[in-house]
Swiss-Prot record:
A cellular component term, taken from the record's GO annotations: plasma membrane
A Pfam family annotated for this UniProt entry: UPF0182
Protein's name according to its UniProt entry: UPF0182 protein CLB_0018
Residue ranges crossing the lipid bilayer per the database entry: 9-29, 49-69, 94-114, 154-174, 202-222, 246-266, 273-293
Keywords: Cell membrane, Membrane, Transmembrane, Transmembrane helix
Compartments, record wording: Cell membrane
Main subcellular localisation: membrane
Organism name: Clostridium botulinum (strain ATCC 19397 / Type A)
Keyword Transmembrane annotated: yes
Length: 893
């Protein structure tokens, strides 16, 4: 028997080791990886905080539970206690082990769950904004109140756990005693039995529970700034004048009740306790009744007047939380009085009008430029570059390896040979080839480059599709890129990776559950494993507390490809701010820059005024760098992020209104304009475009992210909202309010105008015959001085699985003029060379012209030939026939 007991502890330790074996391996690998990326201090910040917290928490839990246990076995008046708990030392040893395990487990759970909130509490940074009810700085609600709430929940849960386990222990031991003594169980003596067993202990615990109910209502008071009971988010009239008063009374009464409970139960007097509990319950019920009465009999009939100051609080703090309080607002009086000189003065804006659209361009990239089946383009990025001395907006994408497409998909192919993507593709957004496809300035493998942008090392070891580990510098050469009938190979010369010593091979074999790490003869001592190669996951691994943009974008700099990810600080704890998408505060506080070859990752603070990112910087020393430390050539490519802009646009639709009375009436609500992608398709929310333009009153073109607003449930455009991003203008926002007494075409209304035009709709119908389909591109509405120029690219897609949309025409509209042209330049000439103020003469003549049947037959013939060539994969013939079709359509026009 003694031998069995002696074996228990070692056996238990072995079981624990096996249970936590994988965590130990992960911990060792994490240390190696964080050391490799030079963020080991960041990793140890968390580990150190957890360990430092665990020690005192473990001591508190262990001593509290042990003392509670000791206090129970001291009661010798109850025989069940002697039999069940105090018979021999073995029970004490067993409880000691149990207490140790439970205490260390609870300490770990608490520390690993709340270390972050404790560090935020200790490193709080003021917002210098006070809430209008309790006049506390916003930092209290974001950095301190969450910790109070967590402590409250944990302590209340533990106290209730003690009460429940005490009752369970009593009933188990009582049953054991009755069975051993062969006595009947008498439920009438339960009250006396529990008092004898744990009366004082339960008295103390009950008093503490009531004390923390008081603390809980104090937390409820502070949480009134998040109330959703009124007409706007935040504390309402009823919350302030009824709910708050009752909460304060409950706090005081429960505080007194906790003291009375402790004193009364110890003395055996239960009447005062019953009175205190009854009063507390009465007040809680009364609070709900009082709030209901105030809301329905005082506020409801005078809501607009009584709620105005609270609505104003909501407006002011929501605008501040979503960074809408610094928008420059201007009236945009549409005159449409452009002269030819104005066109000349805005030539750079017009030359950069985007006629290529995202989706068709990505399809074309993946049809024409993947080179081999295992390459892929994940998405299209838009940016601006100085190309051969000119400021150009471009589309570009990285050519990555899709390891899931490898055939055969062997371990060597996946992890040792096909280790990286290769190269990038770039085209200007403002031009297409004669076939209506993107006109490449960088393409092919090895890169064919018509620009001054150097791309000496185009390899992509880190990207959006690099989701698996690779091992480099092995005995097998890495595949670099295909070259005619052979393959070009490469040896990795970057500094990323963990050396594959025997110990590390063993660690990764266990971690990845793959014996190949040990069996492979291709792995050498100086081979390196590169893990966490997905750029977003790499950033999350280092800084999981940041929120990352859904669209990382690539930049070509210093002969290599770099990735930029926008990182946000968010919270749902900003007082009085209306939540959108589960958050009520957001800042684009950091840019993450990642080297696609070496994997170097840097976090640059781009919003020094954000208290949350400054709080993180105080906690994680060495994580963030200043924006000025980023290379100038990288900073020039920082974009205003579309995810942030989209959220701000949603909020602005309601919170452009500053007057509480107008806000209450809901009479001036906006929504982001709708758009239509197909001639007979459904509408969807317009995707805000990045546009190169010269803002009114500015003398230089810049890239602007622009959104169009309609009046809610109407199609008339009411405003233009733009975010600037070039140089010192980065982050500045501007709102142009359009005349409300005029019909201003939104993207959707513009599409309706196109569909209603006799001449254009006739041509669309001709193209949209069976076997082909007309698609709209991305609608652009370009402000030029006090005028609006509308642009709509038209794509023609042939039937067939692998058909590629071709940009065939551009529709331009200005004032009352609407033209269908082969290019932007031709359309501009057609509009501004016209003498009248309506549809140009050419279109008017066309409206009465009959179409030659022979030309229609010829058009059908060339179209059929093009479709046949496409099915056969003969793209040369396809292009020739489509060109002939275009010539016929032009002659009909």
């Amino acid at each position: 028997m003694k031998n069995k007991k002696a074996l228990f502890i070692p056996l238990f330790i072995i079981i624990l080791f096996i249970a936590f074996f994988n965590k130990i391996i992960n911990f060792i690998i994490n240390i190696k990886w964080f050391k490799e990326v030079n963020y080991l201090a960041v990793y140890f910040t968390k580990m150190r905080a957890i360990i430092i917290l665990m020690i005192p928490i473990f001591i508190i839990f262990f001593i509290s539970i042990w003392m509670y246990y000791k206090s129970l076995i001291i009661n010798k008046n109850k025989s069940v206690v002697d039999i069940g708990l105090n018979k021999n030392n073995y029970g004490k040893k067993l409880f000691f082990i149990f207490n140790f395990i439970v205490s260390i487990f609870l300490a770990y759970i608490f520390s690993s769950s709340y270390w972050y909130r404790i560090l935020q509490f200790n490193n709080s940074v003021d917002f210098n904004v006070k809430d209008p009810i309790f006049f506390k700085d916003v930092s209290f609600y974001i950095f301190k109140l969450p910790l109070f709430e967590s402590l409250y929940k944990v302590i209340i849960s533990l106290l209730l756990f003690l009460v429940i386990t005490t009752f369970i222990a009593y009933f188990i031991l009582e049953a054991k005693y009755k069975i051993q003594s062969k006595k009947d169980i008498n439920l009438k003596n339960i009250n006396h039995g529990i008092k004898s067993f744990a009366g004082k202990q339960l008295a103390i615990v009950s008093g503490l529970i009531i004390l923390f109910i008081s603390f809980g209502h104090l937390i409820k008071i502070w949480n009134l700034v998040y109330s959703s009971n009124g007409v706007s988010f935040g504390a309402s009239y009823t919350d302030v004048h009824a709910t708050l008063l009752f909460y304060k009374i409950i706090v005081v009464i429960t505080l007194i009740s906790s003291i009375v409970t402790l004193l009364s139960i110890v003395k055996g007097k239960f009447k005062p306790v019953s009175i205190c509990i009854g009063i507390t319950i009465f007040l809680i019920v009364s609070q709900n009744i009082a709030s209901f009465l105030v809301q329905n009999f005082i506020v409801k009939s005078n809501e607009k007047t009584l709620e105005q100051p609270y609505i104003k609080n909501n407006i002011d703090l929501t605008r501040k939380a979503f960074a809408l309080d610094d928008i420059e607002i201007r009236d945009f009086d549409i005159k449409n009085d452009l002269q030819k000189q104005d066109i000349t003065d805005n030539k750079a804006s017009i030359d950069n009008i985007r006629i290529n659209s995202f989706k068709p361009t990505l399809e074309f990239y993946n049809q024409v430029q993947i080179i081999r089946y295992y390459y892929t383009f994940n998405d299209i990025d838009i940016d601006r570059y100085n190309i051969n001395g000119k400021y150009n907006q471009v589309f570009l994408a990285a050519r990555e390896i899709d390891t899931d497409a490898l055939n055969p998909n062997t371990w060597q192919n996946r992890h040792l040979i096909y280790t990286h993507g290769f190269g990038a593709v770039m085209n200007k957004v403002n031009s297409v080839t004669s076939e209506g496809q993107p006109d490449f300035v960088i393409k092919d493998i090895p890169p064919y480059n018509k620009t001054n942008i150097k791309l000496a090392n185009p390899r992509i070891y880190f990207g959006e599709k690099t989701n698996d580990y690779v091992i480099v510098n092995t005995k097998i050469n890495e595949f670099d890129y295909p070259k005619e009938d052979s393959n070009k190979t490469n040896k990795y010369n970057g500094h990323a990776g963990i050396k594959m010593s025997f110990i590390n091979r063993l660690l990764f074999a266990i971690n990845k559950k793959d014996i190949n790490f040990l069996l492979s003869k291709d792995i050498k001592k100086d081979s390196k494993i590169i893990i966490n190669r997905n750029i977003v996951e790499r950033a999350k691994k280092i800084a999981p507390f940041l929120t990352y943009d859904s669209d990382p974008y690539m930049v070509i700099y210093n002969g290599k490809i770099y990735w930029i990810i926008d990182a946000y600080t968010t919270t749902n704890r900003y007082p009085y701010s209306e939540p959108y998408d589960s958050i009520n505060y957001i800042r684009n506080s950091a840019k993450v820059v990642i080297d696609s070859v070496d994997g170097d990752i840097n976090f640059y603070i781009t919003d020094k005024k954000d208290p949350i990112v400054n709080n993180y910087a105080k906690i994680f020393k060495g994580l963030f760098k200043e924006e000025k430390d980023a290379p100038k050539e990288i900073r020039e490519h920082f974009r205003y992020p579309k995810d942030l802009f989209s959220i701000q646009s949603k909020v602005l639709g309601k919170y452009h209104v500053k007057d509480p009375g107008v806000f209450y009436n809901g009479e001036d609500l906006w929504e982001v304009s709708k758009d239509q992608k197909h001639v007979e398709g459904e509408t969807n929310t317009n995707d805000a475009p990045y546009i190169i333009m010269k803002l009114p009153d500015q003398n230089k073109e810049e890239m602007v992210l622009l959104n169009y607003f309609n009046v809610m449930k109407k199609d008339n455009m009411i405003a233009l909202f733009g975010a600037r991003m070039d140089g010192e203008q980065y982050g500045k926002k501007i709102l142009y309010k359009l005349p409300s007494d005029k019909t201003v075409y939104s993207p959707y209304l513009f599409k309706q105008k196109i569909n209603q035009d006799t001449n254009i709709s006739k041509e669309l119908s001709l193209w949209n015959r069976e076997g082909s389909k007309v698609q709209y591109g991305d609608t652009i509405i370009l402000p030029i001085k006090n005028s609006l120029l509308y642009i709509e690219p038209l794509y023609l897609r042939a039937s067939g699985k692998n058909s590629i949309p071709e940009m065939k025409r551009v529709i331009l509209s200005y004032n009352d003029k609407l033209v269908l042209s082969s290019s932007i330049q031709e359309g501009i000439k057609e509009i501004f060379n016209s003498k009248d103020n309506k549809i140009n003469d050419k279109n008017e003549k066309d409206s009465t012209k009959t179409i030659d049947d022979s030309k229609l037959k010829k058009a059908q013939e060339y179209y059929n030939k093009a479709i046949e060539a496409q099915k056969n994969g003969d793209w040369t013939k396809y292009g020739e026939n489509i060109n002939e079709l275009g010539n016929i359509l032009n002659s009909i026009k």
